[in-house]
Amino acid sequence: MQIEIKDGRSDNSPLPERKLVTLIQESYDSLKDDNEINLSTESTSNLLIKLVLEKLEKHSSLYKYIASVTTLNIEGLNEENANFSLKNDIGASWESKKDGIFNYKLEDKNSNECYLITILWLHK
């Protein structure tokens, strides 16, 4: 078994990278626009994961999907006061020709939050 360490692998994605970005952004926008969801009590990251996974499953049932969201509160951070550090590593055992990973950073300036989104797909 060959083990590879890479920053990301989206060239074999079930969707083009641009479509993945659009899917994530549309999912987030629909959360913000839904007046029935109280984002002060509901977990934005959990709702975002649910919407993204539902949309991915509609595109292809040939894959299993995993979505992860890391939420950063960036309120009060500026160029003089940017004293936080975040490191997230993930590993998987997969077939590199069929499986892959995509990372995306989504910022919401209105809520002072930043979402680091990771999507993995594993061919069934």
Curated annotation (Swiss-Prot):
Gene3D superfamilies, alphabetized: Tctex-1
Its predominant location is cytoplasm
Q: Could you give one GO CC term from the UniProt record?
A: cytoplasm
Q: Which residues form a coiled coil?
A: none
What keyword terms does UniProt attach to this protein? Answer: Cell projection, Cytoplasm
Q: Which domain of life is it from?
A: Eukaryota
Answer yes or no on keyword ATP-binding.
Answer: no
- Subcellular location as annotated: Cytoplasm; Cell projection
Family classification = Belongs to the TDA2 family.
Q: Output this protein's name.
A: Topoisomerase I damage affected protein 2
Source organism (scientific name): Saccharomyces cerevisiae (strain AWRI796)
Q: Species lineage, top-down?
A: Eukaryota, Fungi, Dikarya, Ascomycota, Saccharomycotina
Name of the gene encoding the protein in the UniProt record: TDA2
